[in-house]
Amino acid sequence: MGLDFDAVEYCKGVKTQQSQPPFACPVRGCDRSYKTIMGLQYHLMKYDHDNPQPLTPVLTPSRKKARSRSGGHHSTPRPHKDHPTPGGGGAEARNGCSSASAGGGSASGVSARQYANPESLVSYNEEEATVTFNLDGKSVRLGIDDALPLVEDEEFAALVARGCILNADAPPLEENAPWARVQVPVARVAEIPDYRVSDAPPRPLAYYRFIEKSLEELDGEVEYDVDEEDSAWLEHMNEERQRLGLNAVGIDTMELLMDRLEKESHFQAAANGTPTGVEVDDDAVCCICLDGECQNTNVILFCDMCNLAVHQDCYGVPYIPEGQWLCRRCLQSPSKPVNCVLCPNAGGAFKQTDHGQWAHVVCALWIPEVRFANTVFLEPIDSIETIPPARWRLTCYVCKEKGLGACIQCHRNSCYAAFHVTCAQQAGLYMTMDTVKDGHNDSSMHVQKFAYCHAHTPADAKLKMNVPDFEDTRHKMKEARKALAKKRSTAPVVLIPTIPPDRVQEIATMVTMQRKKEFLDRIIAYWTLKRHYRNGVPLLRRLQSQGNNHGVIQRNGIEGSPDTGELYRQLKYWQCLRQDLERARLLCELVRKREKLKVAFVRISEEVVMLQLNPLEAALNKLLDALEARDSMQIFREPVDTSEVPDYTDIVKQPMDLGTMRAKLKECQYNSLEQLEADFDLMIQNCLAYNNKDTVFYRAGIRMRDQAAPLFVQVRKELQRDGLLARSQRYHVDHVEAEVEQELRLLLAAPASEGIVQKLLILADKSQVLKNPTYRTKKIKQIRLEISRMRKSLQKARFAARHSSHANQSQSDDEDTLGGSPSKKRTRKRFNSSGVDMELGHDDDDEEEDSDEDSMGEDTVSKDLLNSTQTPPCSPIKSLNNSSSPVGINRRTAILLTRKAQAALKRPSEPLTTPVKEEQHNSQSSNTQSTSGSSSSVTTAATAASSGAGTLNHVLSSAPPTASSFALTQNNSSGGGALASGTGIGGSSSAGTAAAASLTSTALAMNSKLSANLPVKSPKRPGRYRRVPEVRHSSSMSPKKSPNPAVTVSQALPMPETLPFERIPDSFRVYRANNQRDVSDSDDAPSQSSSPCSSCSDFSMSGSCSDFDSDEASEGDADGDPDRDGGRSRSEERDSTSQEGTTDAMDMQHASLNNVQGNNGNMAISSSSGGSGGSSSEDDELEERPLSARQNKPMKVGTRGTPTPTTMARAVALSAGRGRGKRRSNLSESTSSTATPPPLRRAGKLRSATPNASPLVNNIKARRNTTAAGSAPLTNNNRSKHSEDSASSERHNNHSHGQKPALEPLQLVWAKCRGYPWYPALILDPKTPKGFVYNGVPLPAPPTDVLALRKNCLDEIVFLVLFFDVKRTWQWLPANKLDILGIDKQLDQQKLVESRKPAERKAVKKAYQDALHYQSQVSDLEGQGPDPIM
């Protein structure tokens, strides 16, 4: 049963009737009373009078016994321990809690008091008799008459720990109260039968997200929506248009026009700077509390439409809104002005009432009877009807208005001055609100409002407010009255929008209708009236908030900066912040450096400790790190992958690499430096044994060996210095060094002879394998110096023997030749006979100069006794070749030399089929020596015998006179003129033999005279150690390419049985490499020679077995045109050597003046220039056509293949005449009387335009083809051969005059694209199928899109090239954009450094290395596992 009256209305009546507490409860039987009306109202509404419960539990009298502990806590406070409760001490002592009387009672003193229910209410009498405390969120009431026993925290904690106080935190007296009985809710569960959870519906792959449009996008859209007024107006307009017979206008058209009118007016106002509202005042205060201060939780908000300034708490805004914020008046009634029902003034913060009216918030706060239904949002305003009528009848003494609104009175009891709240604010009356606590209850807060008239303003308030005197106050009141009257009378400023006519015309173009102008005038008038009715507020809600401040910002932006001071303050703030951040960054950097130094210190300390524990391991670690640093390509870093090279374990039995050495070092398997050095030597030996000499791995092994030697020496010295090297290890001497030293002492002790010279040459080759580079260089220089001295002593002996011998019939000519230039200080002439250098000098005291010259790298081997001095079967060099692959010789070359040497030893037992070319060469060697020494062969033989050249005498005596011929050659590389014999041919008739004999004597005499008349000068060699890039050829031919296979040894030259063994000197048993030559790091271009096999064929005039030759170079003669028979075309003899600084010694030996063509006697003489730039234009013309053509008649010969003496003399004379005009020391040009053309002397590094990408492959293939063909007979079709030679001559003449050779597929070239430097590339055939493998290297097939680009350049000849870049780019390029790669080393170096950008140069170098790697792969015929090009 509830109350039979309204509790709220009763409380309001009590408030008006009774002003002083206490307020008693009107319910019969309830004697409770309260100090406040709110307490009474709460009691009436919450308390259940039908089931009354005691709000405070009944206190147990102190005279009763305390309850047992099992029953709960004591209900009364225990007395102090000095006054124990009777009968209680013994029980507690028995339980072991003797101090419970004090501790328990004292502890319960707090908990034994009455814990009040926060929701319970107390009567007024009970409230007066108790004191309430808030402990941990609980209200505790203590009687004012009860004693307060105390207990310490430690004692209370000990009692709780022992269990003397149970549930110390729970309220003990009210634990059985109904409100304290909290039961856990019991869930009611019912299982639904046959219920299945369905799968989630399929969701789209993307989320739906709303993206707000920008202002520019919104300006282009239609945002206006018609309302009821617009619909009614449009309906009326359409009715009129129908009466006139016009079409109706749609709603969309009206929305478009209204939207454009609104936006154009907004744009015009913004452009003109017209303010559309009140400007924001930075010093604005809250219009409710008149305070300008704000806090983080109570900031001042400004309305975006009317610029109203209010606090959050004053206006009821619990949180700061994001974006636009409008007050309630602007939000709900933007166009219609509102009036306050509580005062006559307009403006300010409005809120709606519960009846739909408007009132000021400040009025609702100050009038006592008015309330807010929601105290958080302060709306709506209610209880206005409870205002007494007397308030409505009061007259405001400020505005003198009566009956307009409700007034409040002065707080002074004796003053009856009344005033409106807003009028008091305008007049500046003293009005204050304070929150105070209730005097009896600390938990309740009250708001006290004090409003005074100007006459009763408190004195302290006057000082704070600086209130003037009475007269000034009256004057201020009058001004406030006038201001309020002006506000009430003035109408709001309505901004009438205007749009220029041109803009109206633009808007009119957007629509199409009948009588457009009339309709536009009517709709503009309608829009203007609607804006005026809305007090100028824009019809678009978005423009309502933008229009107010936009014009102000635009105007300020035109005039200048909006706030320079604020910007300056912000700038200073950010500068200070940046400085602070910079200081923090520097501090962090210092910390980082400190920690870095700490880490470095710890590492150094660790190294010191490890060095003290195991110093040898530290030294070996340092050495191994240095070795790994030398391995820049990381070739030796990891073990060899046997899956890539399956045959590696067949050749290398003990693999070794730096990674394995590192692992062994970590496992402490190295007890000495020698063990590590042995493993390193094993690694290098494995590399040299398995890889070919022309591979990058072989060169890396050589480079690694040379760079590691000083490292081992340095580490050994450091270990010796530190005393870590054992005594037995300190004096370690290489066994090869000991052998070289011992053999050198023995050779120097023996008398000088040619045999000793040959052994010294062998010893110099043996010194190449010494490990110490410094010792190796020093020892090689010493041996070469001894060789030079010994040669000079032998030459002096020969010279004395020649002058003491009997002169022959040409002695006078020789004396003229030797004595032609008596005025010169020094004349050096070298007579080249089968590669032998013979010096004739008039100064005997030049030995020191010559020794220095030889020691600087004169690697030319003396070859004048190669045919006389033979290597015995057990050569000392054999000990050097005991390893599987000695230094300088790869496995293939070593096997080749061994097989050829064995074949040479077996040759005497087989029927000799040596071609005529070899016998002629032997006879030429003997004849050359006899001619160069004196004109008589008998005298030369005697002189040679006296000098120890017995073999020369033997060969000379065994050569028949029919094999004699002559030739004039010049050795430019040796620095002096020399006379050498040409290649003869054996005749089949006696007439030919006689003619050849007579021709020999005549030509030798002419040769002597020509050599005496021409000036001889030794040119300076600019690059002494530079490797001569020109091809070294030999005048000898392979037995399998002999032009006359029918001629046998019995017909040409009888050979003794010991000749094959004697023709294999020691220099052919070992590969002699020159360490001082200039070799590119990227490629060792294989030198070429015309001799197909330098190791087993006879000795040639050019010295094909020199230090620069290799196994690949000896096969150069096999590379040529496939249609030649037994020799090369005469036009291929020309060589453009303009790119090289010096001329090779073999250039002039193969330049011939006579070249007999065919068997009919027609002989064409071609001339080749040995100089690079010294020939004149006349000489060039002579070179461009054969000599027979210049003489305009064919040259007749007496016998088959044998020219007449007259013809030969004429050729020699012509050659001598041309040679005089040249500045370079071209003594003479060689002539050949053979029926077979001499071998082709290549032009520099020019490669033959063959599909093969490597000259080594060409050489080997050509040699195989030649071997398969055998001794093919010569063709007699002279006309066809002459035509082929003419075409070849024309082609090579074009090459010699600067034209490029023909480009063929599978050639390495330099390619040029626009915007890129010259780049290495490979020419490929567009028809290359997929999976094509060339010499074991897979080549890619061109893509279809690349082939489709061919149609873009149909007007010219282009080549498909594949660049060696990272992406393997394809391109079609013409011939003028391509240069052959690998022909000229200077050209290659120029292309490598052509680009100015370091990154491009690095990329070009990398591509160049890839191209060379590809070349080495296709040249690798032993299957070393080449990788695909892509």
Swiss-Prot record:
Zinc finger (C2HC pre-PHD-type): 337-370
PWWP domain sequence ranges: 1305-1378
Binding-site list for Zn(2+) 2: C303, C306, C327, C330
Keywords of this entry: Bromodomain, Metal-binding, Nucleus, Repeat, Zinc, Zinc-finger
Compositional bias (Basic residues): 62-81, 796-805
Zinc finger (C2H2-type): 23-49
Biased composition (Polar residues): 865-887, 1151-1165, 1265-1278
GO biological process: regulation of transcription by RNA polymerase II
Residue ranges of every copy of the Bromo domain listed in the record: 611-715
Amino acid composition bias (Low complexity), ranges on this chain: 922-942, 1034-1043, 1085-1107
One cellular component term from this protein's GO annotations in UniProt: nucleus
Compartment(s) of residence: Nucleus
InterPro entries according to UniProt: Bromodomain (IPR001487), Bromodomain-like_sf (IPR036427), Enhancer_polycomb-like_N (IPR019542), EPHD (IPR034732), Histone_Mod_Regulator (IPR050701), PWWP_dom (IPR000313), Zinc_finger_PHD-type_CS (IPR019786), Znf_C2H2_type (IPR013087)
Comp. bias intervals (Basic and acidic residues): 1121-1137, 1281-1293
Domain of life per record: Eukaryota
Biased composition (Acidic residues): 842-857, 1108-1120
GO MF assignments: acetyltransferase activator activity; zinc ion binding
Chain spans, region Disordered: 51-111, 796-887, 901-942, 1012-1054, 1076-1301
Annotated zinc fingers (PHD-type), start-end: 283-333, 394-457
Role according to the record: Scaffold subunit of the histone acetyltransferase (HAT) Enok complex which has histone H3 acetyltransferase activity. As part of the Enok complex, associates with the Elg1 RFC-like complex and down-regulates its PCNA-unloading function to promote the G1/S transition. May also play a role in maintaining the protein levels and stability of enok.
Oligomer status and interactors: Component of the Enok complex composed of at least Br140, enok, Eaf6 and Ing5. As part of the Enok complex, interacts with elg1 and the Elg1 RFC-like complex.
Entry protein name: Bromodomain-containing protein homolog
Source organism: Drosophila melanogaster
Source taxonomy: Eukaryota, Metazoa, Ecdysozoa, Arthropoda, Hexapoda
